[in-house]
Every structure is written in C-alpha cells, then in structure tokens.
Design a protein with these regions (language model features):
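Conserved NTP-donor binding/palm subdomain of two-metal-ion nucleotidyltransferases/polymerases, i.e.
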Residues: 1-126, 132-369
Length: 369
C-alpha cells in the first residue's frame, strides 16, 4: 500500500528509535505543520508516541516540528515515563509480596518486554499481565498458588473479578492487573490448546532487571515470547492491532530472531508470524529472512492504519443503523481474523449472542472515542 506523508514520517522516526540509528529524512523535508500534527496524533493512536519522540530528538533542528508541538510531545513523554516507573515499582512489589507467600510471578509482555527496547521507559503499555504459580511444588500446586494469589488480594479488600476462565482481574495500587490461569484462550481457539502446551514447556522464567537494576522481576524466555506475542497480535487482528504490537515484534526479532518449536505446524498461525516479520522488515528496520506472508502483511497494514470498521466512535445514529453497522463489523472482523485464528462461524455468533444477552444495553450502545 502507499503510505501518506504522516505515515512515512512516523515509520522513519520509529525505525531510527528502535535501532538507535540516524533518521532517514527524505520524507521529512518540506513537512508542514499539519503533517507533523498528523504524525503525532497517529503515533498517539498507535501506542508509539514515546518511541517516535526518540526519533524526533535525532533530527537536526531545521527538520524538527514546531516548538509548540515539541512541548506537547515532550510533556506527554514525561508523563508516560512517570507511569512506566510506577508500573515497574508496582509489579516488583506485587511479585515480592507473592514470593513471601510461596508464589512465583512471571510478568507477561508489559514492562518485562520493555527491556528489549533501547529506551525501555518509552515502550507504552496498558495493564499488567502476570502468571502466578507455585515457587515450591512440594508445598502447593501451581493451581493452588494461582488461586491463592487472588485470595490474598481479596483479603486485602481488593475486588477480584474471577469470571474469565483465562485470567482474573483486579486493581493493585490503582493499576489494572490480569492474573493468568492460562496464557491463551484455550476454551475458544483450537490452535490455542496446542500453543498453550508448548508455552508451558518453554516459559523458563529468568530474572530481569528494571530501571537500571532498581527492581527485579521474572520474565519468560524468548521462545515463549515468540509464540505469545504472535498469538496476542493474531487475536487483535481485526479488533485493535496497532504499530505498538508491531514494534514489540521488531524488537523481539532484532534481539533473538524467531524461535518456533518444530511441533508447531498450524499453517494459519505460521503465516501470521511471516506477515508480522515481513512488515517489520519493510517498515521497522529488521532484516530477518522468512518465507511467505506478503499478501497477509499488506492486509494487516491496511487494517492497522485504515481500519474498515471503527471499534469506537461509530458514525451512525438510530438503532437500526447501529445494529446494521455492528453486524457488518462483526462479520468482517470474523472473516479476517479467521485467516489467522480459525474459529467456526457458529461459535463466533453464539459467543456474540451470549455476550449481548448478558449485557443487552451493549447492543445499541455507541462506544465513545
């Protein structure tokens, strides 16, 4: 696909930021005030605002955006750096608390993955995903440890949502936490069962330092992250896949390559891995040779930058129009997601019916941007 000016600018900034190199400035010459504004807004939307800022700081003065935009950008970056430090402290404190109770805690994605980046505090994230298990199998099982982790929060007066078979949800010191029982939606996708069993074998937790050694946490192996990130991105295809996910993949590939266990043979999933890698090679400065995925890569990028259907801010009014829009969106998202993670259409429809029966107010609700 052909990139517009602001998209070209953003990719140039990200490539320089991720690989600590000079910015390719061809697309930045004669960039207007509006081009820079659109570049900044796109970076914010795609969850790469702080990463793009590192690229801006590599530019000569005459190619940088206006002082007003730089001030806005710098303030947003500073705010995120403070958020990142708070997340690092929180996950380290939570891990230490659990450790005293005989529970080991592995950080999934998030601040653990940020250590793959040249500037970890500029890798943006949302909630904290953890996997809790027994630190000593002679004293309690992994399942007992995972259950105890939730019970300990309840004892502190923290409300824990345990409705999901995949993970529980709670807020710890104001930060959303997902405590995983399983890594993937094994009850939903057939391929998830196979990948889940592999993930359990290759997790190999290792100690990882955060904030220049101020905190220590456990993180999974590169092989684990290869499969986990690919599956996570695949789930978001059609419903929120962003450059944020692509940058994670680029950093993984740059640091460790792609580690795919030989027992993983699902054609759709392997094509998704190829497509993600193809996009990183084209736009984010990686050079990992992998066959296939070109066509899917094109479709992925189109969906990332110009999604056909919005998840928020639906531009229609009236119950009939909203229902038609959401139905078309559901069918479209199901079709493209099925290219990577197969799920029978009857099951997707049934899941949607169950959700809306439980929460009928969501049928005609228009989510805000």
């Amino acid at each position: 696909m052909t990139l517009c000016k602001s998209e070209q600018m953003l990719f140039a900034l990200l490539k320089a930021s991720l690989h600590q190199q000079e910015v390719e400035t061809e697309c930045l010459h004669q960039a207007s005030v509006d081009d820079w504004k659109q570049c900044y807004l796109l970076a914010c939307k795609q969850g790469v605002m702080a990463l793009a800022w590192d690229g801006v700081m590599k530019l000569p003065q005459e190619l940088q955006p206006s002082k007003g935009l730089k001030l806005t950008w710098a303030m947003a970056v500073e705010a995120y750096e403070k958020k990142y430090a708070r997340y690092c402290q929180t996950v380290a404190e939570l891990s230490e608390f659990y450790q005293k109770q005989g529970i080991a805690t592995v950080q999934l994605k998030g601040v653990g993955l940020s250590t793959y980046y040249p500037n970890p505090s500029h890798r943006e994230g949302g909630d904290i995903d953890i996997f809790t298990f027994s630190a000593d199998k002679n004293k309690m099982s992994d399942g007992e440890a995972n259950k105890l982790a939730d019970e300990l929060m309840v004892k502190q007066g923290i409300e824990v949502d345990m409705h999901s078979p995949k993970h529980s949800n709670f807020f710890y010191k104001g930060i959303p936490i997902e405590n995983h029982k399983t890594f993937l939606n094994v009850e939903r996708f057939p391929i998830a069962v196979q990948v889940e069993s592999i993930l359990k074998k290759v997790i190999n937790p290792q100690h990882t330092a955060l904030l220049n050694g101020e905190y220590q946490i456990l993180t999974p192996s590169a092989c684990f992250n290869t499969l986990f990130l690919a599956f996570h991105s695949a789930q978001h295809y059609g419903s929120g896949l962003a450059l944020h996910h692509l940058c994670d993949w680029a950093m993984l590939v740059s640091k460790y390559g792609i580690q795919i266990p030989k027992e993983l043979t699902d054609r759709r999933f392997l094509e998704a891995i190829s497509a993600l890698t193809c996009l990183c090679n084209r736009y984010l400065g990686t050079s990992y040779v992998i066959p296939g995925g070109e066509l899917l890569a094109d479709e992925m990028l189109e969906e990332i930058l110009h999604p056909k259907y919005l998840q928020r801010g639906i531009a229609v009014k009236g119950k009939i129009n909203i229902f038609v829009y959401k139905t078309k969106r559901f069918l479209y998202m199901s079709r493209i997601n099925n290219r990577i993670l197969y799920l029978p259409m009857w099951k997707r429809v049934w899941e949607s019916i169950v959700i809306h029966v439980r929460k009928p107010d969501t049928i005609f609700r228009v989510e805000q941007k």
